[in-house]
Amino acid sequence: MSKNSVIIVAAGKGKRMNSSISKQFLQIKNKPILYYTLNKFSTHESIDEIVLVALEDKIEVCSDIIDKYNINKVSKIVPGGKERQDSVYNGLKAVSKDCEVVLIHDAARPFVTSDIIENGIRYVNQYGAAACGVIPKDTVKIKDEKGFAIDTPNREDLFIVQTPQCFNYNIILDCHEKLKKHNKKVTDDTMVLENYGKSVYLYEGSYSNIKITTPEDLILGEQILEKLT
């Protein structure tokens, strides 16, 4: 029977947080951010397994969090790579052999909703690849190399991509292997497909589905959690 798998990428060092602790281990309401992220997927009925990608020296810390909070469905914890795309590739190689749909999600994005997860799976079955996100609230400018504004795109044409980014497993694995062969660099997994002419359907995420990257995000995260509980 085919499975829906999720790869949680927790191999970042969080330099922008100005903390010696990796952002996924910082706490909100006395629980680590990683707990909230793992728990959301482990309690979702459509998710069959979780592969957690972590810094090699943090694998034991991750294992302790999983045990402490009785997180189910984590099948493996694997070490990350030099770049995010290398970490994702390690995760892709570790999922179950009968995985059909794979969701790739940031560990530091703990407020993903059940609907976002479910819709991602549904759109993959329909289109082969999908990513959630939001239309920017602010006006966005394009500037030249000297720092002067040269254009103002229509906000309705712009999309701030979030995670999970969701794919047919064979498609994303094939594109990642081509990426390694061609030694290309990307900043997210939708770009992996774009490099090889594949389309990604963009669907509605949530303005609350933030990635906790800076100290200000921690404060906002506490406010979001209070509204959700």
Swiss-Prot record:
EC number: 2.7.7.60
EC category: transferase
Superkingdom, taxonomy of origin: Bacteria
Keyword field: Isoprene biosynthesis, Nucleotidyltransferase, Transferase
Reactions listed under catalytic activity: 2-C-methyl-D-erythritol 4-phosphate + CTP + H(+) = 4-CDP-2-C-methyl-D-erythritol + diphosphate
GO biological process, one term: isopentenyl diphosphate biosynthetic process, methylerythritol 4-phosphate pathway
Annotated site residue numbers, Transition state stabilizer: R16, K23
Pathway(s): Isoprenoid biosynthesis; isopentenyl diphosphate biosynthesis via DXP pathway; isopentenyl diphosphate from 1-deoxy-D-xylulose 5-phosphate: step 2/6
A Gene Ontology molecular function term of the record: 2-C-methyl-D-erythritol 4-phosphate cytidylyltransferase activity
Site (Positions MEP for the nucleophilic attack): R155, K211
Gene3D superfamilies tied to this protein: Spore Coat Polysaccharide Biosynthesis Protein SpsA, Chain A
Family: Belongs to the IspD/TarI cytidylyltransferase family. IspD subfamily.
Database matches in NCBIfam families: ispD (TIGR00453), PRK00155.1-3 (NF001183)
Primary role: Catalyzes the formation of 4-diphosphocytidyl-2-C-methyl-D-erythritol from CTP and 2-C-methyl-D-erythritol 4-phosphate (MEP).
Protein's recorded name: 2-C-methyl-D-erythritol 4-phosphate cytidylyltransferase
Organism of provenance: Clostridium botulinum (strain 657 / Type Ba4)
Lineage: Bacteria, Bacillati, Bacillota, Clostridia, Eubacteriales
